[in-house]
């Protein structure tokens, strides 16, 4: 079943938040700093910004409660060298940037932000999978067909 969901939506480790279809669970972790840390409410992706699509905002409002948000991380791996990792979280760290639009929040750590600044976060729903995805990443040279792996521009 994990292959059907792809690696673009990865479960976190602390507590079950929302059941996904077919028993898939998203899990999460967060602290009281969340509201103070919101640093971007602009829908336009400028220098160092992440833009959220309407479908991303809508899905996040459906699956998050209270101080929960979507965390986007970039890790080494995948077929192209780097891969996107999504999880629900509740803890905002000192090096995190918070991007908020329409009440939905996406948080990116400073190391990962260097690999995704100027990109869009989208939620795609298809017959074979539903997932959050990074689109139009100006830092990516190429990606693979799965949509979760990419190589960077040098």
Curated annotation (Swiss-Prot):
Gene source species: Homo sapiens (Human)
Example GO biological process: iron-sulfur cluster assembly
Top-level taxon in the UniProt lineage: Eukaryota
A GO MF term: 4 iron, 4 sulfur cluster binding
Effect of residue 79 to A: Abolishes the formation of the [2Fe-2S] ISCA2-IBA57 complex formation
Keyword annotations from UniProtKB, A to Z: Disease variant, Iron, Iron-sulfur, Metal-binding, Mitochondrion, Primary mitochondrial disease, Transit peptide
GO CC annotation, single: mitochondrial matrix
Segments of this protein annotated with the region Disordered: 29-49
Name this polypeptide is given: Iron-sulfur cluster assembly 2 homolog, mitochondrial
Subunit structure of this chain's protein: Heterotetramer; forms a dimer of dimers with IBA57. Interacts with [2Fe-2S]-ISCA2 forming the heterodimer [2Fe- 2S]-ISCA2-IBA57 complex; [2Fe-2S] cluster binding is absolutely required to promote the complex formation.
Residues binding Fe cation, per UniProt: 79, 144, 146
Keyword Metal-binding listed: yes
Presequence boundaries: 1-8
Purpose: Involved in the maturation of mitochondrial 4Fe-4S proteins functioning late in the iron-sulfur cluster assembly pathway. May be involved in the binding of an intermediate of Fe/S cluster assembly.
